[in-house]
Amino acid sequence: MHMLEKITKENDIKQIERQDYPALAAEIRDFLIEKVSIHGGHLASNLGTVELTMALHAVMNFPKDKLIFDVGHQSYTHKILTGRKDAFETLRQYDGLSGFPKRNESPCDAFDTGHSSTGISAAMGYSIARDLCGGDEKVAVVIGDGSLTGGMAYEALNGLAQLKTGCVVVINDNNMSIGKNVGGLSKYLNEIRLGNAYNELKTGVESSLMGSKTGKKIAKVLKRSKDNIKQFFVPGMFFEELGITYVGPIDGHDINQMITTFQHAFRLDKPIIIHVKTKKGKGYGYAERHPDYFHGIAPFDRISGKVLAAKKTSCYTDIFAKKMVKLGETHEDVVAITAAMAQGTGLVRFEEAYPKRFFDVGIAEQHAVAFAAGMAAAGMVPVVAIYSSFLQRSYDQILHDVCLQKLHVILAIDRAGLVGQDGETHQGIYDLAYLSHMPHMIVLAPKNRYELEAMLDYAYAYDGPIAIRYPRGSAYKGHADIQTPIVYGKSEVIQEASGVAVFSCGHMMEEADRLVERLEAKQIPVTLVNVRFQSMLDTELLDRLMKTHTVFVTLEDTIMQGGYGEKLHAYLAEKNSPEQYTFISGAIPLPSVPQGTIPELRHHMQIDAEGLAEKIVPCYKKHLK
């Protein structure tokens, strides 16, 4: 690690000789493979952007200049080059180094990211603010070709073209072919279009021609001729038509070429797109051959490439995927929709079985939901599978296009609740709060693997908008012997006693079982309720339990505001005087939740069995007096 030892703070890369950059890139790759193999994280995308990030750092000056990473999972090299190499020992751990850009982690991180297609808008904001304040800082954004399937990216490009602010947009193309390089002529045209002489001449000629009626006609003919030539030779014609200079494709592993290109681009005070071709997973054979598998990966053995994990058990995503195939077989009106998450949501199985009834719309959650609404209006039964963290992007479509029309759209919300080490931007803790107040929407959550299947059957039969929330990770097998029919608005009583009533929402049942065990060990009688319908109360059950219970506890995987417990507490307050009962919330008390393992996070917030038991015991004893 000879070269890497010289990088202790931002801008240190400028002290390294250009001829040594390839050696530094190799050391960075080796370092990334080592650290991600230990801690897990996003590997393939970071291996592919080493030279690209180095080239930007060689040209930019941090923290004055602003570099934004769309999505942000490809920012590891940026973190290394800004003095955070040693912090990789805590990558994605509680109170450790984030796997995404974080402004509170370093002044060199210009903008927090985690979701797709937002980067160009943020960079445009920085550029306009600079112009208004008379600054001279460079602004650049790195966005992947996958993120260009999100409509927001094009909204931002349109804005850039209109405002003409100086901003460099680097398209990191590691998969989807945007355009084909036609060799020397393409390179020659790129060099010309980046040159000052060309741009000054172009501006002068256009101004002169537009000064007269004849000149305008000549300009129109010239533009038509230019467009015909460029349409044949220049792969970025689409961007040129928007009014943004396009350069590329260029080799994303040729540091010298990228440095030269970036230097020229930053000198021009206008929006420029630089299309860079990279190889995802570069430098690690397993990641090159299986880039999707090594996109986000758990700790693994770097020699064999195999994940170091406990014996695999079925997860909720697997259960969902298998059940979807069965639903598709039984019901020909079932269609499946996802937003660039066919693998992650398990819908690849449905795609293989029923390719004509499967639709991956790309990173376009808004479109996915409105598309589903149209299908539902036409008599189909669409199942939209999206991660909780990304579903919030389609809020308006769920409300306006689905709920107000009471359309039969099934939302399969994967990664609901705490997801752990990806941090604030990926926790699935907000969906219930915004879904439960929508007209006609009902939200369910299964207590175990078996109930997820039953809820999907219920969702198919239900005539209206319905959402099912389930987490990442192993599917709970507990209470397999208790499978009562699902009835609208009704909770399920697992065991009934008196004194303490515990209401468990969805997969929190496993934690609830641990809580019940702790309380019963202290001779405290417990009623355990499987909530099932998180968006509504079973008031008939509550009225009965209020006669024999004094302590009411919820275990929830969502934020407190707008959660199930908030509704429960309000109902208790309406029906009782304060001295008659105690309510203890096991919902998430924080507005945002940092990275960490799920047990760590629950313990920190005191919403695990241990923390809740400590609150319950004294309250129960108080009511005995």
Range-by-range predicted roles:
Residues 87-97, 162-176, 197, 403-415:
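A glycine-rich helix N-cap at a beta->alpha junction
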Residues 4, 175-320:
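Long, well-ordered, tryptophan-enriched scaffold segments
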Residues 260-263, 295-296, 315-330, 346-352, ...:
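Glycine-/acidic-rich phosphate or pyrophosphate-binding loops and their flanking alpha/beta elements
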Residues 299-302, 307-312, 420-422, 442, ...:
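Peripheral docking tails and interdomain loops at the edges
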Residues 66, 278-280, 284-391, 397-406, ...:
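Non-catalytic terminal/interface segments that mediate subunit docking, oligomerization
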Residues 1-81, 240, 244-246, 251-255, ...:
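N-terminal amphipathic, basic-rich helices that act as targeting or association modules
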Residues 42-163, 333-334, 338-339, 347-348:
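Cofactor-binding active-site loop characterized by glycine-rich and histidine/acidic residues
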Residues 218-286, 408-413, 432-481, 609-625:
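Structural signature of the thiamine diphosphate
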